[in-house]
Swiss-Prot record:
InterPro entries on file: ATP-synt_VA_C, ATP-synth_a_Xtn, ATP_synth_asu-like_sf, ATPase_a/bsu_AS, ATPase_F1/V1/A1_a/bsu_N, ATPase_F1/V1/A1_a/bsu_N_sf, ATPase_F1/V1/A1_a/bsu_nucl-bd, ATPase_F1/V1_b/a_C
SUPFAM superfamilies: C-terminal domain of alpha and beta subunits of F1 ATP synthase, N-terminal domain of alpha and beta subunits of F1 ATP synthase, P-loop containing nucleoside triphosphate hydrolases
Subunit text: V-ATPase is a heteromultimeric enzyme made up of two complexes: the ATP-hydrolytic V1 complex and the proton translocation V0 complex. The V1 complex consists of three catalytic AB heterodimers that form a heterohexamer, three peripheral stalks each consisting of EG heterodimers, one central rotor including subunits D and F, and the regulatory subunits C and H. The proton translocation complex V0 consists of the proton transport subunit a, a ring of proteolipid subunits c9c'', rotary subunit d, subunits e and f, and the accessory subunits VhaAC45 and ATP6AP2.
Biological role: Catalytic subunit of the V1 complex of vacuolar(H+)-ATPase (V-ATPase), a multisubunit enzyme composed of a peripheral complex (V1) that hydrolyzes ATP and a membrane integral complex (V0) that translocates protons. V-ATPase is responsible for acidifying and maintaining the pH of intracellular compartments and in some cell types, is targeted to the plasma membrane, where it is responsible for acidifying the extracellular environment.
Family: Belongs to the ATPase alpha/beta chains family.
Name of the coding gene: Vha68-1
Record comment: activity regulation: ATP hydrolysis occurs at the interface between the nucleotide-binding domains of subunits A and B. ATP hydrolysis triggers a conformational change in the subunits D and F, which induces a shift of subunit d. The c-ring is subsequently rotated and results in a continuous proton translocation across the membrane.
Residues that, per the record, bind ATP: 247-254
Pfam families linked to this entry: ATP-synt_ab, ATP-synt_ab_N, ATP-synt_ab_Xtn, ATP-synt_VA_C
Taxonomic source organism: Drosophila melanogaster (Fruit fly)
Identification of the protein by name: V-type proton ATPase catalytic subunit A isoform 1
Entry superkingdom: Eukaryota
An example Gene Ontology CC term for this record: proton-transporting V-type ATPase complex
Alphabetized UniProt keyword annotations: ATP-binding, Hydrogen ion transport, Ion transport, Nucleotide-binding, Translocase, Transport
Amino acid sequence: MSNLRKFKDEERESEYGRVYAVSGPVVTAEAMSGSAMYELVRVGYYELVGEIIRLEGDMATIQVYEETSGVTVGDPVLRTGKPLSVELGPGIMGSIFDGIQRPLRDIGVMTNSIYIPKGVNTTALSRSEMWEFNPLNVRVGSHITGGDLYGVVHENTLVKQRMIVAPRAKGTVRYIAPAGNYNLEDIVLETEFDGEITKHTMLQVWPVRQPRPVTEKLPANHPLFTGQRVLDSLFPCVQGGTTAIPGAFGCGKTVISQALSKYSNSDVIIYVGCGERGNEMSEVLRDFPELTCEIDGVTESIMKRTALVANTSNMPVAAREASIYTGITLSEYFRDMGYNVAMMADSTSRWAEALREISGRLAEMPADSGYPAYLGARLATFYERAGRVKCLGNPEREGSVSIVGAVSPPGGDFSDPVTSATLGIVQVFWGLDKKLAQRKHFPSINWLISYSKYMRALDEYYDKNYPEFVPLRTKVKEILQEEEDLSEIVQLVGKASLAETDKVTLEVAKLLKDDFLQQNSYSPYDRVCPFYKTVGMLRNIMAFYETARHAVESTAQSDNKITWNTIRESMGGIMYQLSSMKFKDPVKDGEQKIKADYDQLYEDLQQAFRNLED
């Protein structure tokens, strides 16, 4: 009996395994019995960060999130006993992390180098920085559970971090810190449950692969305004929605996702650069601090509401996979405070390629185009973490996470496995067109193939705030579709042989394409287009279409019939005004003046047609 192994002897068991084989970012280790799936390990003498992705006997397969050159067989592998997690707390906004939440700015200061050294071990959030903590109405003796708010930290002038009790914690409050300055290691809350005392700091740690719990998911009902006319009017997304932007190289995916992060009506932006060019991330870092948005009459830098997860194409492949999960976990943390968060993933194709590379190293059975068979499932687990929710705990609050994923299919081919898997999951599809981009028509959204499944959900919002908008949108889509059908005839027989009403349709479609759907992201007047301006422009163009068509149809049988040429000659001024509606600057001119100008143009337009018909 005496030589039987007892449980207490297990503690003597070594926490070290040994490296058995190395293949690129995939390391196999032996003597790893007792370790768990997705456990975080430190590989080799440099202590490289890795994660267990397969267990077989006492062998573990580890994907390493750093460069593995120099790791040899027999090197130690240290088990940490916890999953890959991110730190959540004050200090996230305005910072830039890599795929596994290492703070790039701090590492740069610490090492004085432009490269990240191997096995660097820094905390994601600064432990020494002091934050001003203000307790909410939580007193000693009150009962709290996971998700309850117990304090507020003003992280900066744009974002107030509401301190949340960790989702699994509960108990009676024994101590709550008075208002004052604390760092992330100071205890601000103590709870007791079943005689067990738990101490809480302002810092929470959460595993990235696990969604944060919520009370219930709610249907989305408020639009995510992007400031891009073509998207807001024809293919709207909702707060808490999922969107894909597939497009070939040079079509302007990054410009659209940057415009979204600059001008959308979200409270917090998480921008994940996943395997894209390094200079795109540096462009974001250069532009965002200079960009401002106005909140309650005060101009603030946009960087204050943004966190960047940068994982450029020359960083280790495995970390690309983690970067998407890091980004979505940060987003869920702010959602739980009751904010509307927008997460940009640029681009999910690179993430899928990282999956493909790791899967190839593991010798798994490849499916379509060499991607692993679980590609669709992985994409779904990521996109399904979006949504509008009722948050855990008290007071009652609602938050949302909207995901906008850019997809770059090779050669702009939308039948690529990543694109087709993504389109099966997301609700909004903004398809970018190479031909439009070559014609310098930006944003190069192809209005014939794009779609949004949120139209029905948003009808109530539009009816309440912009009652004339829905019929206008339907009419625009009809005109653009009609123009597509007519263009084939025009190529065969020329414009002159068309019916007069068709000529009107063609000209109005041209007006729509050149002066409504096109938008210059680099001009002060047009880089963002508020929704009232979009609706005003639509109303006037459609009024012109209806009246012109009516004038042509009603006089077709009479002697002095009005043709399109007559209209064009007598309406030069009106048509010029219609095409220059976009030059009204929402910042300089203001909402009142723009609306008044558009109403005046509407009156002039009706009057001009009355004069013409008389």
